[in-house]
Amino acid sequence: MRKLLIFSSLVVLLGVSSCIKEKQTGADLVVGDVVPDFTAVMSDGSEVTGAQLREGVCCIVFFTTSCPDCRQVLPHMQRLRNEYQPQGVRFAFISRAEGAESIREYWIANGYNIPFSAQTDRDIYELFAASRVPRIYICRDGLIKSIFTDSPTLSYEELAAAIDICIL
């Protein structure tokens, strides 16, 4: 019984850490870097490009619905989008190696209405980062002004304050 408990604990720990630590490949953008070129087709049929996001204020969110930290921050992001999009802030929700069907199911189950780009690979993600989701970039006029990951745990207030600084 003890061996089963230890084995089960290890399996759970490995699963939880999989959204945080992965093999390191890809860019490592920092505050002050320029939003890279990319094109993503969103779930509503629209297209988002790096060039579009280099104009004005934007928030780029990389996520997977299986990641516990992403699940914690997505309600904040829905609220931020509802509040700041009318002020001209653009939002791009881009999955990291997750297909449309599982995202759509998660969105429906949680009442989200955010357009997303389902990326079955890590190509767009790796233009920005090598590891860790959630990963949120708040940018103004093409420059990354703030980067948020899962550590420390993200609050709505922190994210809103970073957007406020960019729109003032």
Give the location of each predicted region.
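Sec-dependent N-terminal signal peptides
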Residues: 4-13
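C-terminal motif of bacterial Sec signal peptides marking the signal peptidase cleavage site
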Residues: 15-18
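N-terminal "domain-start" segment that seeds a small globular fold
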Residues: 20-50
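Short active-site neighborhood of thiol/selenol oxidoreductases, capturing the structured segment around
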Residues: 50-71, 77
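Hydrophobic beta-strand anchors of alpha/beta hydrolase catalytic cores
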Residues: 59-60, 91, 136
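Structural microenvironment flanking redox-active thiols in thiol-disulfide oxidoreductases
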Residues: 71-110, 121-126
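Short, internal strand/loop/helix patches
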Residues: 107-141
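Thiol-/selenol-based redox modules, centered on thioredoxin-like
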Residues: 138-168
